[in-house]
């Protein structure tokens, strides 16, 4: 058993009743290792609703900020998009919307953020997070089209129009 396997085993052996702090302690050791199995394991944790919210948010931030291969970036972006539409907590959805700002070049991310920003029944915090992640994409054709749709929104329209003006598109 190598170090990655050992740490994954330790994490799993702690079980569902282990505190978030105990799980985070193991994750900190695991994250130091450069091994593709680490990303795979973190993705499993991110998608596991039985994990404590603190663990899932920590994993999300690690995946957002950590070194990823091109293939891993696509996989992580897909997992983050799933969190936007699932029954996850508002905080996790908010963190996913913000994290997707790092993945705007990946197919499917901009439409997912646009749909969320345009959804009037969602929380304004979540919609604004999606908008700021869209803004990070810069003035691409797809992003500009989404922002034009959003520019008439009662809550976000003013901020959107300001971005379009700053980009010299309105």
Model-based region annotation:
Residues 13, 25-33:
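Alpha-helical segment of the N-proximal tetratricopeptide repeat
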Residues 28-31, 47, 61-65, 101-102, ...:
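Structural signature of alpha-helical solenoid repeat scaffolds
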Residues 53-67, 125, 129, 137, ...:
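Long amphipathic alpha-helical scaffold regions
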Residues 80, 84, 91-98:
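Eukaryote-skewed repeat-based solenoidal scaffolds used as protein-protein interaction platforms
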Residues 16-21, 36, 51-54, 89-91, ...:
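Alpha-helix N-cap/helix-start positions at coil->helix boundaries
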Residues 122-159, 169-170:
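Extended alpha-helical scaffolding segments
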Residues 23-26, 56-59, 96, 127-130, ...:
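Conserved hydrophobic register position within alpha-solenoid helical repeats
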Residues 1-14, 35-47, 69-85, 104-118, ...:
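Amphipathic alpha-helical scaffolding segments comprising HEAT/armadillo-like alpha-solenoid repeats
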């Amino acid at each position: 058993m190598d170090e990655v396997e050992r740490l994954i085993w330790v994490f799993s052996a702690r079980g569902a009743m282990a505190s978030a702090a105990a799980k985070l302690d193991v994750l900190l050791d695991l994250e130091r290792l450069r091994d593709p199995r680490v990303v795979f394991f973190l993705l499993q944790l991110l998608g596991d609703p039985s994990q404590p919210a603190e663990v899932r948010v920590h994993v999300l931030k690690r995946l957002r900020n950590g070194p990823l291969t091109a293939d891993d970036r696509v996989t992580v972006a897909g997992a983050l998009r799933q969190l936007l539409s699932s029954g996850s907590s508002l905080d996790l959805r908010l963190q996913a919307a913000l994290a997707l700002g790092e993945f705007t070049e990946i197919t499917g991310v901009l439409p997912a953020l646009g749909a969320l920003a345009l959804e009037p029944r969602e929380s304004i915090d979540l919609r604004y997070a999606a908008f700021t992640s869209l803004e990070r994409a810069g003035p691409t054709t797809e992003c500009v089209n989404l922002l034009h749709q959003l520019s008439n929104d009662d809550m976000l329209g003013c901020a959107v129009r300001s971005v379009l003006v700053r980009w010299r598109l309105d």
